[in-house]
A protein has these predicted regions:
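Primarily the internal scaffold of c-type cytochrome electron-transfer domains
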Residues: 1-22, 28-33, 45, 49-76, ...
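Membrane-interface segments at the starts/ends of alpha-helical transmembrane spans
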Residues: 77-81
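Exposed beta-sheet edge/beta-hairpin loop segments within beta-rich domains
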Residues: 83-85
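Conserved catalytic alpha/beta cores of large enzymes that bind or transform nucleotide phosphates
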Residues: 89-103
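Conserved hydrophobic register position within alpha-solenoid helical repeats
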Residues: 413-416, 431
C-alpha cells in the first residue's frame, strides 16, 4: 500500500506503508526510511508513524493531531510524522514488541533495530524463556525445584512483583537503564513521572497521557494489596466480571451498602449507578481511546470549588450548562475534559459554568451525607498553595513530603519534594 503525503523535505510524494500496528479501535501505519540495500531482513531501519489513522469501529479515517496543537505541523517540527516524536523506535516499540534492541549507531545516525516478536509475547512479561524450555525438554525424571518454572515469579502473596512487571508499559516514565525483565524492580530501570502540572492535576488525577500505574499507586486498593489480575485477565486484559460485579466481587459487604441507590443516589442501571463512573472517571486520548483514572478515589466537588480540580460528579452534570455557553463554542465541548481545558485556557464563560456545576454537585453531596460527609485534608491543597506562592505554603508542603505512606501516597510525597527542590529548598528528608 502507498500513501501520498508531505515528506520531511516538505514536498508531496509517495511512501510505501511497511507496517501496521495499534490497539482496537486505533490502527496506525508506518513507513521505513533510510534502509540500506544490504541490511539483513532481521533488522529494521528508522520507522516513522503516519498521523493519518483508521478507526476500526467507526470505519473512518481521521487525523491524529498532537494535544494542544491545532495548527499545521511543519516538516522540521518534532511532532511532524517524520519527526523524532513520531518515531517507532523511540515512542512505540518498547511496549508494542518483545526483546527490542534499538541498535542506534550515532556515527551513522542510523538504526539497526531487532526484536524477537512484533507483539507483546510471553517473554515480555514472564522474562526470558530459555531456562523454562530447557527444563520442559529435559529428559530427567525430576523437576529441578531450584529453578521453579524458570520464569519470573509473578504470583504469590506480594502484589508488587506483578505490578512492577506491568508498570513499564502502563506508566509514563523515563528510561534510566536498559534490560528490564519481568520480575525486576521498576525503579531500578525507570524514572516514574511525578505530579507535574502539565501531566496530572494537583490532586493526582490523570491529565495528560500518563497511563495507569502512577494513578493506581495513589489508591487505597493498591495499599490494600490489590493487583492488576484481581480485575483484569492477564492475557486478554479484559475485565473478569461485567459492570459493577468487577467491584462487588470483592466489596461483598452487607446487602444494601454499595450497589444500591442509598449509596450512589442514582437510578439503578443508569450511568450514575456504575461504580467506575464515580470512582474511575475517564479521559479520551488519541481521539478514540477512553482510559479510566485508576486512583479509585471518592469524588471531591468541594476540592473542585476550592482548587479547580475535576470531579466525577461534574464530569456527568456539566453538560447541563451547555445552553449557557455561546453557540459557536458548544461543538468543541464534547467531553468534560474539553470544559476543563477551556476553563484553564482562560475562557471565563466556560469557567463560570464549570464552577456552577461544581458548586451544585458539592451542595448535593452535602445534602446526601450531611454531618457524615468525609472531607479529609488533601495533599493537593498544599501543592496548589505552594504553586500560588501563598504564605505558609512551604511548611504545608514540607508536611506533605515527610508524611508516612499510610497518610499520603508516595507519588504525592515525591512530587512535594520535587516542588520544593525546584524552588531551591534543600535538606528535606522523607521517611
Amino acid at each position: 500500500f502507498m500513501v501520498y503525503t508531505e515528506g520531511e523535505d516538505g514536498e508531496m510524494q509517495d511512501f510505501e506503508v511497511k507496517y501496521v500496528f495499534g490497539f482496537s479501535p486505533l490502527q496506525q501505519y508506518m513507513v521505513e526510511f533510510d534502509r540500506p540495500v544490504d541490511m539483513p531482513p532481521t533488522e529494521v531501519a528508522r520507522v516513522q508513524v503516519l498521523r493519518i489513522t483508521w478507526d476500526t469501529l467507526k470505519e473512518k479515517w481521521f487525523y491524529l493531531r498532537p494535544p494542544d496543537v491545532p495548527e499545521k505541523l511543519e516538516p522540521d517540527d518534532p511532532l511532524h510524522w517524520t519527526g523524532v516524536a513520531q518515531r517507532w523506535q523511540t515512542m512505540c516499540a518498547d511496549c508494542h514488541s518483545t526483546n527490542l534492541k534499538r541498535n542506534f549507531d550515532p556515527a551513522e545516525q542510523a538504526y539497526h533495530t531487532t526484536f524477537s516478536e512484533i507483539d507483546v509475547s510471553c517473554e515480555a512479561c514472564h522474562g526470558p524463556g530459555s531456562l523454562h524450555l530447557e527444563l520442559a525438554n529435559s529428559k530427567s525424571l525430576f523437576w529441578d525445584r531450584r529453578h521453579g518454572y524458570g520464569l519470573a515469579k509473578l504470583k504469590g502473596e506480594n502484589a508488587e512483583t506483578q505490578l512492577q512487571t506491568c508498570a513499564p508499559c502502563h506508566s509514563r516514565r523515563g528510561v534510566l537503564s536498559e534490560g528490564f525483565h519481568g520480575g525486576d524492580e521498576f525503579c531500578d530501570f525507570y524514572n516514574l513521572e511525578l505530579l507535574r502540572d502539565d501531566t496530572y492535576f494537583a490532586d493526582g488525577q490523570i491529565k495528560d497521557e500518563v497511563y495507569v500505574y502512577g494513578s493506581f499507586i495513589q489508591s487505597k486498593m493498591y495499599h490494600k494489596g490489590i493487583r492488576c489480575t484481581d480485575c483484569h485477565d492477564p492475557h486478554s486484559l479484559k475485565l473478569k466480571s461485567p459492570g459493577n460485579e468487577t467491584c462487588t466481587s470483592c466489596h461483598q459487604h452487607a446487602a444494601g451498602k454499595y450497589d444500591v441507590p442509598s449509596h450512589h443516589h442514582h437510578v439503578p442501571g443508569t450511568a450514575g449507578a456504575m461504580c467506575v463512573n464515580c470512582h474511575m472517571p475517564h479521559r479520551t486520548y488519541m481521539d478514540v481511546d477512553k482510559r479510566r483514572d485508576h486512583s479509585l478515589r471518592v469524588p471531591r466537588p468541594d476540592l473542585s470549588v476550592a482548587l479547580g480540580t475535576p470531579n466525577a460528579c461534574s464530569g456527568c452534570h456539566v453538560k447541563d450548562q451547555l445552553k449557557s455557553i455561546d453557540q459557536q463554542k458548544q461543538p468543541s465541548l464534547l467531553e468534560y475534559a474539553d470544559w476543563i481545558e477551556a476553563a484553564e485556557a482562560g475562557d471565563e464563560q466556560v469557567a463560570a459554568a464549570v464552577l456552577k456545576t461544581d458548586e451544585w454537585c458539592d451542595a448535593a453531596c452535602e445534602k446526601w451525607y450531611g454531618e457524615n460527609r468525609k472531607q479529609p485534608k488533601h495533599f493537593s491543597e498544599a501543592i496548589v498553595a505552594f504553586r500560588n506562592g501563598e504564605p505558609g505554603a512551604m511548611n504545608e508542603l514540607l508536611r506533605v513530603a515527610t508524611q508516612p505512606e499510610e497518610l499520603t501516597p508516595v507519588l504525592a510525597r515525591a512530587s512535594a519534594l520535587g516542588e520544593l527542590a525546584a524552588s531551591g529548598v534543600g535538606n528535606v528528608t522523607a521517611k
